[in-house]
């Protein structure tokens, strides 16, 4: 399945995912920009109030997808392509599909378009939490490079951070992904988790199945943790700490004014 997903254009993958979700008896909502005539997201409400999120586009041109060469070292569990693999973020899409195929769990599902360029899919759902899902405990985006990493961006909910770290992740810093738009708008905490790719956005991008599987197991644990998802984890924006500002101002005065 993973190779099939890697070879699809964003449009082909969009259609494929709509069909899969319908087969799983989800009520599927397709978000569309009628002015631009572009489809922006796929949303499917489940009975577990955790949103699993991945984006459908890659940085590589769609026309290179169909005939791309894919190499697999089965002993090392590594996949790569000289055409640009696109595991960012097809690895996240694949994880969501495997959860649906291999378990009876029914989390909320959200797939967005054009994260790598405009973030238009995330923008389109930023005001639609109640309409699409109702209650949301928190959001898991599956779009981070590497292994065992979790990123919270500008969400400063320390209790939520401790919860995610308790599953075996280590907090790192990041710049942008869809939850950077969605979570502040929804007022709900979110995290981006590693899904096993390295050297993304380059022609030497590699995908490591063991790294991916480690996160897969942890996400299953999170989806089964009813005590955790029974509450809503609030989005708390980061603020510049007042005590740090005071220290900064004091240091400036001392250096320039001798005070």
Where are these regions (language model features)?
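Acidic/histidine-rich catalytic neighborhood of metal-dependent amide-processing enzymes
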Residues: 83-164, 171
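Zn-dependent metallopeptidase/amidohydrolase metal-coordination segment
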Residues: 170-215
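His/Asp/Glu-rich mid-to-C-terminal helical/loop segments that flank catalytic regions of hydrolases
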Residues: 199-259
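A non-catalytic alpha/beta surface segment that caps or lines the substrate-entry region
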Residues: 3-48
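Active-site metal-coordination/substrate-binding segment of hydrolases
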Residues: 30, 44-106
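Short secondary-structure junctions
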Residues: 23-33, 70-73, 167-171
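An extended, acidic, His-containing surface patch that forms the Zn2+-binding/catalytic region
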Residues: 150-186, 256-259
């Amino acid at each position: 399945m993973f190779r099939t997903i890697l070879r699809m254009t964003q449009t082909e993958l969009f259609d494929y995912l709509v069909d899969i979700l319908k087969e799983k008896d989800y009520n599927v909502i397709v978000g569309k920009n009628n002015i631009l005539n572009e489809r922006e997201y796929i949303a499917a409400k489940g009975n577990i109030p955790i949103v699993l999120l991945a984006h459908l586009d890659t940085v590589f041109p769609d026309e290179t997808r169909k005939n791309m060469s894919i190499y697999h070292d089965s002993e090392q569990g590594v996949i790569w392509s000289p055409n640009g693999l696109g595991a960012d973020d097809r690895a996240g899409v694949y994880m969501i599909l495997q959860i649906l195929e291999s378990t009876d769990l029914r989390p909320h599902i959200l797939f967005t378009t054009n994260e790598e360029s405009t973030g238009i899919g995330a923008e389109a759902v930023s005001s639609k939490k109640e309409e699409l899902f109702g209650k949301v405990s928190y959001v898991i985006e599956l779009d981070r490079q590497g292994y065992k990493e979790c990123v919270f961006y500008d969400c400063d909910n320390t209790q939520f951070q401790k919860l995610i770290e308790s599953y075996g992740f280590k907090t790192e810093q990041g710049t942008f992904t869809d939850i950077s738009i969605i979570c502040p708008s929804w007022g709900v905490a979110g995290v981006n988790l590693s899904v096993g790719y390295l050297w993304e956005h380059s022609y030497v991008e590699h995908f490591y199945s063991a790294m991916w599987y480690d996160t897969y197991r942890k996400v299953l644990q999170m989806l089964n943790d009813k005590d955790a998802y029974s509450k809503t984890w609030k989005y708390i924006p980061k603020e510049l700490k007042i005590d740090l500002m005071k220290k900064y101002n004091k240091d400036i005065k001392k250096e320039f004014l001798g005070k």
